[in-house]
Amino acid sequence: MEGISALEKNVAELTVMDVYDIASAVGQEFERVIDQYGCEVIGRLMPKVVRVLEILEVLVSRNHINPEMEELRLELDRLRLERMDRIEKEKKHLKELELVEDVWRGEAQDLLNQISQLQEENKQLLTNLSHKDVNLTEEEFQKHEGMSERERQVMKKLKEVVDKQRDEIRARDRELVLKNEDVEALQQQQSRLIKINHDLRHRVTVVEAQGKALIEQKVELEAYLQTKEQEAASMRIEIGKLRDKLKGEHHTNGEEIKTETLNEECIFETEKFSLDLKDSNRPRFTLQELRDVLHERNELKAKVFMLQEELAYYKSEEAEEENKLPQSLPVINSKAPIPQESGIKRLFSFFSRDKKRMPMMQKNVHFQESFGEWTNYNRDDVYTEQGQEALQHM
């Protein structure tokens, strides 16, 4: 994609730098037209082209939105959904409370009706007694006392029912608060378990990589040991052949001395290869001990690496807790940004300044040099805020 020009790219893949390349190409075309026909030909066309390129720059910069804004938008949607769920739960709880209150009011109304009915009966009995001139007997007096006692029992029962229902409502409220706390604790535990799971997966990958490295070391050591054993066997075979050859030759003493020296040299070579057991400077460990040392070293390296990972994880967790802000959502600045001059406008203003200097210079060579310097300068320094943001995400 590097060889494709900005005009041949897909519209969705355009960046602010591509817009600047298009502006540079348009400026070169304007240069050719001015060289042939003069500045008056494109005097009215140039501001319109500059405006179109500025609009294209703004649209391209809007397409490259910062991913952090997208994450904040998703977080805002999630918080809104949680808020709606909480509101629905509260509505459900209020409906339950309303049902309980309706039941309580119905029972209270029934008891009040009974009280009013008993009071009416009592009044009726009192009026009947007042109209009669008969003296109250002891039996009737006890009956009247029994009616008042019944009313007191009904009132007492009504009060107990009201207190009981009030206690039930308070208990329901406490249960709801406890359930909300349990839900929040479970959410925190879930996030903590997700972090631990991620850490464990990272450790598993590290251990697997170390296991592969140990297996490769084991294979290399076995191959090395096998080659050394083969070399030792070949050396033993050669020594045996030399001994047989020397035994078959019975010549002069000088030749015997030579054979003895050759035999001693061969024995010295074999002993030198297989490590002299009488040498005090020879290594004091076997191949299995070497493997154990290497295995222990790799285990210690793995432990050190895991401890470093744990330390980095806890440091990052502490840094996150310290950097938490009290507000849940970022406050959007209501002040409008100060409008800055567009890179396209700077490009064409620089181009127009160069064209004003052209009658005083040679037309072709000096203009090409000034335009090349302008393009390099524009690429390095003249960027709008949208262009800088696009370059950061490229």
Curated annotation (Swiss-Prot):
Compartments, as annotated in UniProt: Cytoplasm, Cytosol; Cytoplasm, Cytoskeleton, Microtubule organizing center, Centrosome; Cell projection, Cilium
Annotated keywords: Cell projection, Cilium, Coiled coil, Cytoplasm, Cytoskeleton, Protein transport, Transport
Coiled-coil regions listed in the entry: 68-327
Gene from which this protein is expressed: rilpl1
Location of the RH2 domain: 282-347
GO CC term, one of those recorded: ciliary basal body
Name this polypeptide is given: RILP-like protein 1
Role of this protein: Plays a role in the regulation of cell shape and polarity. Plays a role in cellular protein transport, including protein transport away from primary cilia. Neuroprotective protein.
Limits of the RH1 domain: 2-89
CDD domains to which the protein is assigned, alphabetical: RILP-like
Organism: Xenopus laevis
GO-annotated molecular function: dynein light intermediate chain binding; protein dimerization activity; small GTPase binding
GO biological process, one term: nitric oxide mediated signal transduction
